[in-house]
UniProtKB/Swiss-Prot annotation:
Gene name of this polypeptide: aat
Coiled-coil ranges from the UniProt annotation: none
Gene Ontology CC annotations of this record: cytoplasm
HAMAP family documented for this protein: Leu_Phe_trans (MF_00688)
Protein name: Leucyl/phenylalanyl-tRNA--protein transferase
Amino acid sequence: MAGSRRKSPGITPEILLRAYSIGLFPMAESADDPEIFWVEPELRGVLPLDHFHLSKSLAKTVRRKPFEIRFDHAFDSVIAACAEETSGRPSTWINKTIRSLYATLFDMGHAHTVEAWDGDKLVGGLYGVSLGSAFFGESMFSRRTDASKICLVHLVERLRERGFTLLDTQFTTEHLKTFGAIDVAKADYAVMLAAAMQSPHLKF
């Protein structure tokens, strides 16, 4: 995780939004660690909204509509699922403080979810933060094949429709790169972020 890290003795929702506006985001070492630190990567993950890549197979799955997609319906359940340890994710950086802070951002209209439902079961989802014309993706989970991928497709569609200009993924992964995610140098990211912060806060 190249970049700077600095511990924070206490964070309010207002401080958290300010941090996002200048390129910082919070993490914890583990779900059980109460400490939170700020992260500012040297290379920032960005998913260009005008160069989103959707494979033919996933596009076919999306058209089949295997799940009901909901927005902002079950925020607490989504972040709790993202914080769960799984066989593929033995540890998580989402501690109780982070869950509480983002729940408050949700109440303020700055944190949002995209959710995949199979009947009355939440089977996949993601959450993130909107500010200006930027959306900062935080975490995702999947309990069914392609559920989180389908949520990402619907997120990008939503952001395009609403006029968002920046989808920040924090870091790139091989998984995100298949959708077109790229690494952006800190200085270049700062320019992109500043432009997004000049926009009025867009409705998600």
